[in-house]
Amino acid sequence: MVLFSEDHIQETRRRGRIEVICGSMFSGKTEELIRRMKRAKFARQRVEIFKPAIDTRYSEEDVVSHDSHSIASTPIDSSASILLFTSEIDVVGIDEAQFFDDGLIDVCRQLANNGIRVIIAGLDMDFKGNPFGPMPQLCAIADEVSKVHAICVKCGDLASFSHRTVKNDKQVLLGETAEYEPLCRECYLRARGEDGQKI
């Protein structure tokens, strides 16, 4: 009598997927990314997290939320570099995805197709309310999209917009509370009008 046969062992295969966490500044995107990555580590999964090398606001190497929670990361200049670090990885985290080049879309697709869980966090819109970097395409190819919201600093409603409070028209301006504030649609439109910006 055979009590245990290899025929009955089901091989656990990795299931790749793409998860996107998007929203305005101060909405908890990085916080949620860190939470998911730490849960994966607790489950003994092999994880690697990446951030754009240009983001040195809180740390040159770690991913750090506005609430000062952090996780070790690898800063990179090009999305293609991610593939160099992921041969033995189960879960890949990517923070501030809006700052990466459009090659990130194919990189994430390739990782997921190879059985890797990819968790992406980033701004879905820039300070003008326009889609930001590769985020729209990443949302389109994602298996799951979580839109998180901040609280409007003017009225307390849910905030979806990142209003820039300093005079600078560059799309990329790394900043914190001194440069940006989260606003709901109504307060954002009002603030843009007061700034003399096109709405």
Swiss-Prot record:
Name of the top EC class for this enzyme: transferase
Active site: E96 (proton acceptor)
GO biological process, one term: thymidine metabolic process
Primary location class: cytoplasm
Residues where ATP binds: G23, S24, M25, F26, S27, G28, K29, T30, D95, E96, A97, Q98
Subunit structure: Homotetramer.
Protein name listed in UniProt: Thymidine kinase
Organism: Bacteroides thetaiotaomicron (strain ATCC 29148 / DSM 2079 / JCM 5827 / CCUG 10774 / NCTC 10582 / VPI-5482 / E50)
Lineage: Bacteria, Pseudomonadati, Bacteroidota, Bacteroidia, Bacteroidales
